[in-house]
C-alpha cells in the first residue's frame, strides 16, 4: 500500500511538471522560445556528427551545445526526440516524454549515454539558442496555423524542424496545407516535409512532400501527429503554411474504416489514442 501511494505521488509530480489537464499536455509555445533547445542532424542523415562537428553546427547558428539541465527543461514541456545527440561537455543522450518499446527502453526522462571518451563517435546534436528562429514546436490547441521559418519569406538553407501535435484522447487531427512551395526534385531528397501518424518520426510514416503542389488533407488515426521539415544547403523556396483542426470522434469523417482519398482528404485507419 505504501509503495502504491509513493508511486501515485511520483506520477502526479511528473504529470504536474508537464502540465497535464483533461488528458493532454498543455503547452502550445514554440520550444525554441520557451526552452531554447532544438535537435540537429547532419544533412547526410542521423548519427553523422562528431563532437567537434556538433559544436560547430550549433555555433554556426548562434547557439551552443545544450547542457543536460537545458535538455531536461525542454523535455518537461514536451520535447521528445528519439535520436541520441551530443550535449555540452561531450555528453550524449536524448529526451523521452512518452515511453515506448522501440525508443527509450520503455523509460521517460533523458536517456543518458554519459560523457563519451571518444569524441570521434558520431551522433546528432542538441543545441541551445533562446533567440533562434521559430522552427518547430509542440501544440495542444484545438486548432492552429503554423509556418516554415521566415514565411512568407523564403526559408533558410540547412533547416531541420519538428512539429508535434497532441490533442485529447479520442480526438483526431485534420491537417490542411494552405500554401506549399519547396524545392522540387523527383525523389524529394533536397527540401521536404515528412508527416508521421505518431508521436515521433520513427513510426507511422504517412508521406514525404516537396515541390509546389498542395498535398491532400490528412486525418490522423489518433490524437497525435509529427511533422518534420528539412532543407538542404543550396536552393530555397517560399515555404509553407499548414493548418490543423480537431476532428471530434463523433463526426462522420472520423469513422472512416479504410485508408482512402475522398475529395482532397486522406483518411488513415486505426485506433484513436497514441498517448
From Swiss-Prot:
Record keyword Calcium present: yes
Compartments in which it is found: Secreted
Carbohydrate attachment residues: 118, 258
Boundaries of every Link domain copy: 36-129
Annotated tissue distribution: Expressed in epiphyseal and metaphyseal bone marrow of both the femur and tibia (at protein level).
Annotated SMART domains: CUB, LINK
Sequence segments annotated as region (Disordered): 253-275
Disulphide-bonded residues: 58-127, 82-103, 135-161, 188-210
Knockout mutant characteristics: Mutant female mice are infertile due to impaired cumulus oophorus expansion upon gonadotropin surge. Mutant mice have twice the bone mass of wild-type littermates. They show increased trabecular number and trabecular thickness.
Keywords: Calcium, Cell adhesion, Disulfide bond, Glycoprotein, Hydrolase, Metal-binding, Secreted, Signal
Gene Ontology terms for molecular function: calcium ion binding; carboxylesterase activity; fibronectin binding; hyaluronic acid binding
CDD domains xrefs: CUB (cd00041), Link_domain_TSG_6_like (cd03515)
Record bears the keyword Disulfide bond: yes
Record's GO cellular component terms: extracellular region; extracellular space
Binding positions for Ca(2+) per the UniProt entry: 183, 191, 232, 234-235
Residue ranges of domain CUB in the record: 135-247
Domain notes: The Link domain interacts with various extracellular matrix components, including heparin, heparan sulfates, hyaluronan and I-alpha-I complex. It is required for binding to various chemokines.
Role played: Major regulator of extracellular matrix organization during tissue remodeling. Catalyzes the transfer of a heavy chain (HC) from inter-alpha-inhibitor (I-alpha-I) complex to hyaluronan. Cleaves the ester bond between the C-terminus of the HC and GalNAc residue of the chondroitin sulfate chain in I-alpha-I complex followed by transesterification of the HC to hyaluronan. In the process, potentiates the antiprotease function of I-alpha-I complex through release of free bikunin.
Protein name per Swiss-Prot or TrEMBL: Tumor necrosis factor-inducible gene 6 protein
Organism for this UniProt entry: Mus musculus
